[in-house]
């Protein structure tokens, strides 16, 4: 179990940073350097099928040749309509808005467990990158909360979002990242024997 927590800590931070920080941010430089290694998949601790491994390696390699800053802007900031918004309540709230009911439930979780959350001013905490990094924090400091957080707050919507992102064409790095994250989350789900409630997606 301790090894599972260590993997959640490692991959929660690594993948969360890729979704949360702009590619030009110095805090993600080391992560991008990791993916630039020709043999990074050999260091990946969660086993993948050979065809899947080859596909993801090729996607990410090709994607790293593109302008990631522009792609990040188009996918996660705008100004055009976002094809796969990175906030949970956009999918879980009937109004398809940020700051929806699922975010309030997440905030209640944070408040009940006295988890101080530092994000950008007025930013919803249910951003995929923030929530992956929060999973890492919990694995490191309060692992007894992981089951509730993952099953009730992250895994309810993240696979749906990641599937949508993986299908957005011509953004190879983020397509590969989404597919890799799907595999990682499924691994966490099975290793922790999580039961995730079925929800209705409004988008």
What does each model-identified segment do?
Residues 1-203:
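Charged, alpha-helix-forming regions
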């Amino acid at each position: 179990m301790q090894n599972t927590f260590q993997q959640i800590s490692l991959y929660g931070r690594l993948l969360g940073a890729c979704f949360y920080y702009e590619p030009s941010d110095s805090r993600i430089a080391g992560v991008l350097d990791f993916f630039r290694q020709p043999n990074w998949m050999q260091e990946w601790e969660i086993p993948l099928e050979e065809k899947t491994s080859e596909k993801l390696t090729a996607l990410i390699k090709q994607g790293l040749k593109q302008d990631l800053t522009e792609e990040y802007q188009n996918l996660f900031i705008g100004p055009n309509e976002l094809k796969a918004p990175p906030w949970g309540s956009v999918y879980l709230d009937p109004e398809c808005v940020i700051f929806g009911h699922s975010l309030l439930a997440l905030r209640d979780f944070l408040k009940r467990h006295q988890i101080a959350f530092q994000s950008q001013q007025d930013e919803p905490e249910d951003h995929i990158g923030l929530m992956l990094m929060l999973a890492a924090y919990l694995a490191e400091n309060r692992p007894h909360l992981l089951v509730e957080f993952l099953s009730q707050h992250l895994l309810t919507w993240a696979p749906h979002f990641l599937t949508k992102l993986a299908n957005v064409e011509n953004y190879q790095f983020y397509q590969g990242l989404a597919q890799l994250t799907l595999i990682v989350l499924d691994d966490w789900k099975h290793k922790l024997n999580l039961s995730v409630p079925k929800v209705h997606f409004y988008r």
